[in-house]
């Protein structure tokens, strides 16, 4: 059943997940339709007034903003195709992200702030039930705002519906892509953290780490709700442990700081979640129309910088840094589990060479980790004006930030898929039972690393397990 949208408050992160990941459609409710129609009527009464300048409606675009248009020029501009703005190229965004962008596009529309023609608004909503969306490149998004990407996404729609003043501008202006990208990152981060907790708990118990490292008393002492989440997450999964003798002294730093590093990742996830919720329901249009009941001053239409979401890239950068640090912990623990004098386990978990040797998995993890370090560089404002000329002189870096966190997250999944079989091997060589809460993970890992004597490369097995992890993360 389609989600009914009446107000901006209906554009929640939960609804975005249903639409973007679950493939659900949306319908504009009667209140939304009334608001859109009234706003359009009021807007059309404004555009002929000589005392009001409306960017891109009775003026030209970009460097032509100072030029006033006569009515015939206005309509010609409104109907002009946007092919020339679809100028970037490269790897396409996933379908789930495209659906999230269309969903977020409705925030400007639903209460009339975009003054979009009602039939165009209905056409935007209908895109979510008409099959695959137009392909949009993730690369080359170096323009001010999001006009390069949104031109790709809405170009077919503009070719099949009648456009009037401001309609084209309302489709390609604002920052719905930023809202969608940070929403996608936040949703995935929450699911991925559960996977991290599973694999880290499996590794900590495989190491036979003292349970006191995750003691509940630490929650109040550390005085941090995110660290408290991590401590509890590890305790829930490990439970009372295997019931035998525990390691008599402290585990290495990489295990003792697990909850701290997980806690920081949880903080980054929560921050991205908050910004996603704010952004999905935010009005970001330029120019933006103030319905009569919202006006504080005399202005009825104003130009804004709403198309530049500065918080979304910062939030995604924090996620990239967090998953990079998690990968560092994973690679250190993978190595320590195989280091007998440190782990108190059989050296190399009983297989110092030959087909059952797992030491090279830890080497591969260092490679993932180093690539992630490159991706974790801060995403700053672009340093040159380039094609912006007189007006559009600062680009939005939001696509860069999303692409980096997306790739870094995939690399973390590979690191976790490398650590899990090493941890499982430790249980097997010691005969200790896997905690009940982690038996599903153990079974999934064993499915991709069967103990059947078959000789095969480890890399493809890790890739298959990582792909399984990823499918679960993005499950609707």
What do the PLM-derived regions correspond to, one by one?
Residues 2-24, 28-50, 135, 149-151, ...:
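C-terminal auxiliary extensions adjacent to catalytic cores
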Residues 61, 107-108, 128, 140-142, ...:
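Acidic, glycine-rich active-site loops and adjacent beta-strand->loop/helix elements
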């Amino acid at each position: 059943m389609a989600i009914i949208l009446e107000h901006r408050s209906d554009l929640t992160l939960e609804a975005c997940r249903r639409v973007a990941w679950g493939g659900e459609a949306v319908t504009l409710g009667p209140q939304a339709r009334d608001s859109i129609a009234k706003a359009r009527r009021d807007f059309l009464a404004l555009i002929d007034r000589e005392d009001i300048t409306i960017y891109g409606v009775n003026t030209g675009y970009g460097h032509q903003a100072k030029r006033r248009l006569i009515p015939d020029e206005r309509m010609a501009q409104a109907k002009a195709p946007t092919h020339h703005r679809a100028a970037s190229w490269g790897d396409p965004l996933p379908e789930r992200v495209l659906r999230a962008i269309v969903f977020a596009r409705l925030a400007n529309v639903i209460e009339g702030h975009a003054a979009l023609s009602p039939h165009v608004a209905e056409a935007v909503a209908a895109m979510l039930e008409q099959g695959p969306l137009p392909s949009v490149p993730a690369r080359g998004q170096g323009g001010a705002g999001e006009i390069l990407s949104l031109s790709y996404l809405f170009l077919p729609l503009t070719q099949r519906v009648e456009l009037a003043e401001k309609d084209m501008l309302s489709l390609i202006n604002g920052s719905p892509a930023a809202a969608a990208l940070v929403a996608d990152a936040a949703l995935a981060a929450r699911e991925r953290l559960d996977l991290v907790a599973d694999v880290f708990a499996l590794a900590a118990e495989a190491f036979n780490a003292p349970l006191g490292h995750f003691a509940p008393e630490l929650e109040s002492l550390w005085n941090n709700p995110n660290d408290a989440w991590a401590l509890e997450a590890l305790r829930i999964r490990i439970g009372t442990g295997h019931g035998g003798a525990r390691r008599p002294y402290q585990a290495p730093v990489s295990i003792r700081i697990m909850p701290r590093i997980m806690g920081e990742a949880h903080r980054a996830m929560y921050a991205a979640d908050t910004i996603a919720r704010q952004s999905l329901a935010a009005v970001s249009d330029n120019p933006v129309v103030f319905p009569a009941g919202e006006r504080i001053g005399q202005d009825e239409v104003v130009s804004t910088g709403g198309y530049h979401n500065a918080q979304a890239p910062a939030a995604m950068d924090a996620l990239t840094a967090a998953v990079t640090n998690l990968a560092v912990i994973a690679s250190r623990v993978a190595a320590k589990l195989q280091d007998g004098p440190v782990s108190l386990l059989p050296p190399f978990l009983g297989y110092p060479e030959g087909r059952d040797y797992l030491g090279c998995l830890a080497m591969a993890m260092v490679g993932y980790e180093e690539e992630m370090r490159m991706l974790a560089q801060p995403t700053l404002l672009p340093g040159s004006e380039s094609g912006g000329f007189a007006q559009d002189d600062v680009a939005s870096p939001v696509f860069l930030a999303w692409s980096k966190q997306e790739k870094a997250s995939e690399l973390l999944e590979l690191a976790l898929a490398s650590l899990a079989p090493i941890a499982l091997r430790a249980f097997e060589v010691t005969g200790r039972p896997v905690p009940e809460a982690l038996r599903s993970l153990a079974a999934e890992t064993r499915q991709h690393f069967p103990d059947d004597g078959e000789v095969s490369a480890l890399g493809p097995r890790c890739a298959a397990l990582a792909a399984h992890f990823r499918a679960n993360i993005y499950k609707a």
